[in-house]
């Protein structure tokens, strides 16, 4: 990480750096856009561009100062067409009072005043400049500043503040939105001091698959309560009622069972059965009687 240009009180804590690394916010793509080159730390041998997380932290603080400078939080619009960022923008809006657009951005939201969903925000924040290109394009028509989470291959046209980070991973997106919300609340004074811990865990900003959660709930409902305890108790009681030290005579001698099985010689004539009799025709019947009469020519 490059030397920080921030005042000492704004420097990130070791826990913040560990969270950024654990969420893989520093891993970019293999493509590099020319305007994102100043935020590049190095390129790995496999071609993956590594982002300087020191620059990421500086841009998070810059974006938080811009957001905190707006008097009415409802004039801030947070947008995410990418599924991994929809939960994060909804939580960000709930904690900071911003307006969230999660999902498809309806064309004309910022330019067509006839539509019912028309908005006039003073600032928009997007999760991905590529998937939210329509919102950025309309913001450029009406002079709305844009803050965007930009990867190494993201287009930066009409983006005023780019936060360099991995904007494709669910954990990276959720963590950046969580850090941004925390810094905004600190600057607004909602959190008393910078040493005060925020009681909202970062997991609330992570994307969760609705189908996976629904299947998990169904599995929990169909599970019979106490079935495992009953089965375990029955097995334990069965084991307790047996004496494992008592063995059958000769059980400890190798080959005893095989010798007992082969002690009596096997005789195929012992049963007294007649193999020829079983194939004989029933009494009173002859092959001549059963065969049809031959035709006389």
From Swiss-Prot:
Question: Could you tell me the keywords of this UniProt record?
Answer: Cytoplasm, Ribonucleoprotein, Ribosomal protein
One GO molecular-function annotation for this sequence?
structural constituent of ribosome
Chief location bin: cytoplasm
Q: Which Gene3D superfamilies match?
A: Glucose-6-phosphate isomerase like protein, domain 1
The subcellular localization recorded is: Cytoplasm
Q: Subunit structure, briefly? A: Component of the small ribosomal subunit. Mature ribosomes consist of a small (40S) and a large (60S) subunit. The 40S subunit contains about 33 different proteins and 1 molecule of RNA (18S). The 60S subunit contains about 49 different proteins and 3 molecules of RNA (25S, 5.8S and 5S). Interacts with rps21.
**Name of the protein this chain belongs to:** Small ribosomal subunit protein uS2
Q: What residue spans carry the Low complexity bias annotation?
A: 263-289
Gene Ontology CC terms: cytosolic small ribosomal subunit
Q: Which GO terms describe its biological process?
A: ribosomal small subunit assembly; translation
NCBIfam families from the entry? uS2_euk_arch (TIGR01012)
Keyword Repeat on entry: no
Where in this chain does the entry annotate a coiled-coil region? none
Q: Where is this region: Disordered?
A: 263-297
């Amino acid at each position: 990480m490059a030397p920080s240009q921030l005042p000492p009180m704004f420097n990130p804590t070791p826990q913040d750096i560990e969270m950024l690394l654990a969420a893989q916010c520093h891993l970019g793509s293999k493509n590099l856009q020319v305007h994102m080159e100043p935020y590049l730390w190095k390129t790995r041998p496999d071609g993956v561009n590594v982002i300087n997380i020191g620059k990421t932290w500086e841009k998070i603080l810059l974006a938080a100062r811009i957001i905190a400078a707006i008097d009415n939080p409802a004039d801030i619009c947070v947008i995410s067409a990418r599924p991994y960022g929809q939960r994060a923008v909804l939580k960000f809006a709930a904690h900071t009072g911003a307006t969230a657009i999660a999902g498809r951005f309806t064309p004309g939201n910022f330019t067509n005043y006839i539509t019912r969903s028309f908005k006039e925000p003073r600032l928009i924040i997007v999760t991905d400049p590529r998937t939210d290109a329509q919102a950025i394009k309309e913001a450029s028509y009406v002079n709305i500043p844009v803050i965007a989470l930009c990867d190494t291959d993201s287009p930066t046209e009409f983006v005023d503040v780019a936060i360099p980070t991995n904007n494709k991973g669910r954990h990276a997106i959720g963590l950046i939105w969580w850090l941004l919300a925390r810094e905004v609340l600190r600057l607004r004074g909602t959190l008393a001091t910078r040493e005060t811990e925020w009681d909202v865990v970062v997991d609330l900003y992570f994307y969760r698959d609705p189908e996976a959660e629904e299947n998990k709930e169904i599995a929990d409902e169909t599970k019979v309560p106490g079935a495992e305890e009953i089965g375990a108790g029955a097995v334990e009681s069965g084991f307790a009622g047996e004496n494992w030290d008592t063995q059958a005579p000769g059980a400890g001698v190798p080959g005893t069972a095989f010798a007992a099985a082969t002690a009596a010689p096997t005789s195929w004539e012992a049963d007294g059965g007649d193999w020829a009799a079983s194939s004989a025709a029933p009494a009173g019947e002859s092959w001549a009687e059963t065969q049809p009469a031959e035709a006389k020519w």
